[in-house]
From Swiss-Prot:
This is Protein RecA. Belongs to the RecA family. The keyword ATP-binding applies. Can catalyze the hydrolysis of ATP in the presence of single-stranded DNA, the ATP-dependent uptake of single-stranded DNA by duplex DNA, and the ATP-dependent hybridization of homologous single-stranded DNAs. It interacts with LexA causing its activation and leading to its autocatalytic cleavage.
C-alpha cells in the first residue's frame, strides 16, 4: 500500500469516527429532550415483527398474513348485511380469549348483546360506549388508546359519527365536509398513540354511491379520504351467496378482499361461511384449507380423510369434523404446519363456490344436504 493510499484510508476512518461521535451525541440529545424511544435504529427496535390478532376465520388470517396487525388502524367496509359487525365481534372474542381487553364504540346504537355472546364475546367484560356525537365517540377512542390498557377498539360505524354541529342544527341544514374534517383531525391525533400503545382500532364503514360516475366504480366510503390513508389494512367484505338447506336459509358465504395492506402482500381474497346466530364457521374455513392442501380429498360430493370417506356434501363433512374433535384438531395442526412451510393455496384462500361447473355442483349439494 502506497503512502497516498494509506493517508486516504486513515482520513476516511477518522471522518467515520467523527460522524459516529456526532451521531451518538445528537441521538442522546434527542432522547433527553423528547424521551427514550423517540428515535432509534430500526435494527434496535424491540418489535421488528408486527404482532397480529386472529380474525376468527383461518382463511382470512392467511390472507392478512396472520390477522389484524397490532398497533394499527384497520377499516372494514361493505354493503349492508355483509358481515362487518360479525367480523369485528369475532376479533373481540379472540382478544378476550387471550386475556385482552376490548371496547366497542356503538355509534349506530345497534349492538345485540345476545348475538355477541353467541359468537363467544364475554359481554360482561366488554367495554361499550354509545356516544351522542362524533366528537364524543372519537374522544373516547383517544382516551382508551392513551390508557394503554385496551387491546382492541371497534368503532361501528364511521357513517354514524355525526358531528355536533349537525346534531344541534335543524333537519335539512347543510354542514358540508364536517364529517370528513372530524375524521381527518381524529386520525392525526390518535395514529401516533395507537402505534405506541399497541392497540388495534377497527373502523367499520358503509358504502355510498358517487353521483354522475359513468365509468369506473361509483362506490365510495363515508368520512372523506383520511381513513383510507391512515389505515394499514382495508377490507372489502361482500355477500356472494346465500346458504340454504332446501328452502331454508341458514347463512351466507362472505368474500373479503384485502384492498390495502401495509404489513403483508395486499389484494388477497378470503372466503368463509357466516351462519345465522352462530357467526363465522371456523370448521368450514378449516375444511376449505384442508381441501386446498390435499389433507382432505374431495371426489364429487364425497370428502375423504386418510382414504376413508367422512361425509357426503360439505355440510355433512363439517358436522363429522365437529363430532370428531381429535381428528379435527389433528387436521388443523397439519394445515397450519403446511401453510407455515409455504404451501400455496388459490389466492391464499378458496375460490368462489360457483367459479366453475364442478364447484357449481357442489354448491347445489350444500343447499340440499341436511
Amino acid at each position: 500500500m502506497s503512502f497516498e493510499e494509506r493517508r486516504k484510508k486513515d482520513s476516511k476512518e477518522s471522518s467515520s469516527k467523527e460522524k459516529d461521535k456526532a451521531l451518538n451525541l445528537v441521538l442522546g440529545q434527542i432522547e433527553r429532550n423528547f424521551g427514550r424511544g423517540s428515535i432509534m435504529r430500526l435494527g434496535d427496535a424491540s418489535r421488528m415483527k408486527v404482532e397480529t390478532i386472529s380474525t376468527g376465520a383461518l382463511t382470512l388470517d392467511l390472507a392478512l398474513g396472520g390477522g389484524y396487525p397490532k398497533g394499527r388502524v384497520v377499516e372494514v367496509y361493505g354493503p349492508e348485511s355483509s358481515g362487518k359487525t360479525t367480523l369485528t365481534l369475532h376479533a373481540i372474542a379472540e382478544v378476550q380469549k387471550n386475556g385482552g381487553i376490548a371496547a366497542f364504540v356503538d355509534a349506530e346504537h345497534a349492538l345485540d348483546p345476545v348475538y355477541a355472546a353467541s359468537l363467544g364475546v364475554d359481554v360482561e367484560n366488554l367495554l361499550v360506549s354509545q356516544p351522542d356525537t362524533g366528537e364524543m365517540a372519537l374522544e373516547i377512542v383517544d382516551q382508551l388508546i392513551r390508557s394503554t390498557a385496551v387491546d382492541l377498539v371497534v368503532v361501528d360505524s364511521v357513517a354514524a359519527l355525526t358531528p355536533r354541529a349537525e346534531i344541534e342544527g335543524e333537519m335539512g341544514d347543510h354542514v358540508i365536509g364536517s364529517q370528513a374534517r372530524l375524521m381527518s383531525q381524529a386520525m392525526r391525533k390518535i395514529t401516533g398513540n395507537i402505534g405506541k400503545s399497541g392497540c388495534t382500532v377497527i373502523f367499520l364503514n358503509q358504502l355510498r354511491l358517487k353521483i354522475g360516475v359513468t365509468y369506473g366504480n361509483p362506490e365510495t366510503t363515508t368520512g372523506g379520504n383520511a381513513l383510507k390513508f391512515y389505515a394499514s389494512v382495508r377490507l372489502d367484505i361482500r355477500r356472494i351467496q346465500t346458504l340454504k338447506r332446501g328452502t331454508e336459509e341458514y347463512g351466507i358465504r362472505a368474500k373479503v378482499k384485502v384492498a390495502k395492506n401495509k404489513v403483508a402482500p395486499p389484494f388477497r381474497i378470503a372466503e368463509f361461511d357466516i351462519l345465522f346466530g352462530k357467526g363465522i364457521s371456523t370448521t368450514g374455513c378449516l375444511l376449505d384449507l384442508a381441501e386446498e392442501t390435499n389433507i382432505i380429498i374431495r371426489r364429487g360430493a364425497w370428502y375423504s380423510y386418510e382414504g376413508e370417506n367422512i361425509g357426503q356434501g360439505r355440510d355433512n363433512t363439517i358436522i363429522w369434523l365437529d363430532q370428531n374433535l381429535e381428528i379435527k384438531k389433528k387436521v388443523e395442526g397439519i394445515v397450519k404446519s403446511k401453510l407455515t412451510e409455504g404451501t400455496e393455496v388459490s389466492s391464499n384462500s378458496m375460490k368462489a363456490l360457483n367459479s366453475n361447473p364442478e364447484n357449481a355442483v357442489i354448491a347445489n349439494d350444500i343447499k340440499t344436504v341436511a
